Amino acid sequence: MTSALVLIVVLIAVVVIVALLVTGRPDAAWKQLASDIGAEFIKGGMLRSSKVQAQVKQRTVTLDIYTVPHGKSSSTYTRLRSSVQNRDGLEFTVSREGLMSKVGKALGSRDVEIGISDFDSDFLVQGNNENSLRTLLSDAKLRELIQGQRSIRLSLKGEELHFQAPGVIKDVPRLKSLFELFGVLLDRLEA
């Protein structure tokens, strides 16, 4: 049993290392981002990614990457995370419309329509309080920042605000807009 566990750990480590080598480290872009927004760049090691941590609205927002092994391949994602004081217990997920979300809708998956046609047609919004989501997403600046992301999965669950997108994001203006998005969301959620 112990040798099998060691083998699994070694295989996961190899997958992570290969993924980092294939996708490249975002260090140069992330150092620039940290400098531009007054954040801290923390260099990664062999088995952990580099990260950027910024204080946004008195919360620590962390940018990093993670890799999910599956079968003989793996997928790498860029993510941002922050704790949030979620007094109302609101939970939601916002993602771009795609084939799977359209199939889900056809099979009865709920999509919260906020009443703004271009946003409603481009995004799948799910959550536990439709009125709160409509109020939150009525904010033009918030919608603009969400719409500026070509790939997005933004969620609030419990006390964590979370963004993820496939691949390693090295585009500094896009990363800045993600930190701005978190700032606007933290303002609205903790008001």
Question: What residue spans do the PLM features occupy?
Answer:
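N-terminal signal-anchor transmembrane alpha helix of single-pass membrane proteins
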Residues: 1-33
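Charged, low-complexity intrinsically disordered regions
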Residues: 29-59, 67-191
